[in-house]
Amino acid sequence: MSSGLYSMEKKEFDKVLDLERVKPYGDTMNDGKVQLSFTLPLKNNERSAEAAKQIALKMGLEEPSVVMQQSLDEEFTFFVVYGNFVQSVNYNEIHVEAVNSEILSMEETDEYIKENIGRKIVVVGASTGTDAHTVGIDAIMNMKGYAGHYGLERYEMIDAYNLGSQVANEDFIKKAVELEADVLLVSQTVTQKNVHIQNMTHLIELLEAEGLRDRFVLLCGGPRINNEIAKELGYDAGFGPGRFADDVATFAVKTLNDRMNS
């Protein structure tokens, strides 16, 4: 039989969501339960487990508990820690600038281009700089797309050119001019030491130096990119995790149409 530890009848629990004091949800409302995972460069033993608990305490978690520890090799150990987060955030004070309020489907995007732009648009994309990863740019550009969302190559009214990975910014710009691109899409997967920020800034500087910045709708995407960061760097929009070709295409065609009519 259950001890009653989780019985709603034997214990007082918060049941109301307060948007001014939002906390993580574990088992019940406002309990602040969180799960944290990290690796320590230490052997797998009792001392390293205690080190993991103390790190969690210094992060502000109460009653931390190491629930899993596993050796990665002789000198490194992976930990999973549970704890209680006692702080909260005021959800009502959080304001985020969304890229798109309404996402068009592939068919709707094609129809929008026909009605408002009147010609095919050209999109050139690449993983620029030293980034050798193509998973991000392929998910947006390739015909098969990703997770049930077709890529830009399948769109009837979009000529999509995927230049692949490790494309120098200078070559990227040269190809964009050659293809008379309307939209440039930069994918950045590698983010160690903020190399993605440096590379994206370099592209902006090159475009501005050549007087080409306003010629293109300039977009970027990646696991550590959001719209706020993108706009701070000088891009028109940024797309992070959970975004698909639909999101990119919708913003691109609407922005292009606005510029043509301004």
UniProtKB/Swiss-Prot annotation:
Quickly give the catalysed reaction. Answer: (3S)-3,6-diaminohexanoate = (3S,5S)-3,5-diaminohexanoate; D-lysine = (2R,5S)-2,5-diaminohexanoate
Q: Which organism is it from?
A: Acetoanaerobium sticklandii (strain ATCC 12662 / DSM 519 / JCM 1433 / CCUG 9281 / NCIMB 10654 / HF) (Clostridium sticklandii)
Task: Give the organism's phylogenetic lineage.
Answer: Bacteria, Bacillati, Bacillota, Clostridia, Peptostreptococcales
Q: What is this protein called?
A: Lysine 5,6-aminomutase beta subunit
Alphabetical keyword list: Cobalamin, Cobalt, Isomerase, Metal-binding, Pyridoxal phosphate
Record function comment: Catalyzes the migration of the L-beta-lysine and D-lysine epsilon amino group to the delta carbon to produce 3,5-diaminohexanoate and 2,5-diaminohexanoate, respectively.
Similarity remark: Belongs to the KamE family.
Q: Which residues form the B12-binding domain?
A: 120-262
UniProt xrefs under Pfam families: B12-binding, OAM_dimer
Q: How is its activity regulated?
A: Rapidly inactivated in the presence of D-lysine and to a lesser extent in the absence of adenosylcobalamin (Adocbl). Activity is stable in the presence of Adocbl when D-lysine is absent. Adocbl imparts thermal stability at 37 degrees Celsius.
Q: State the needed cofactors, names only.
A: adenosylcob(III)alamin; pyridoxal 5'-phosphate
- Which is one GO molecular function term here? D-lysine 5,6-aminomutase activity
Highest taxon above the source species: Bacteria
Record carries keyword Cell membrane: no
| Residue list for modification N6-(pyridoxal phosphate)lysine | 144
Q: Which residues bind adenosylcob(III)alamin?
A: 130-136, 185-192, 219-223, 239-244
What is known about its subunit structure?
Heterotetramer of 2 alpha and 2 beta subunits.
Enumerate the InterPro entries for this protein. Cobalamin-bd (IPR006158), Cobalamin-bd_sf (IPR036724), KamE_N (IPR028991), KamE_N_sf (IPR036843)
The pathway noted for it is: Amino-acid metabolism; lysine degradation
Judged by the first EC level, this protein's enzyme class is: isomerase
Q: What is its EC number?
A: 5.4.3.3
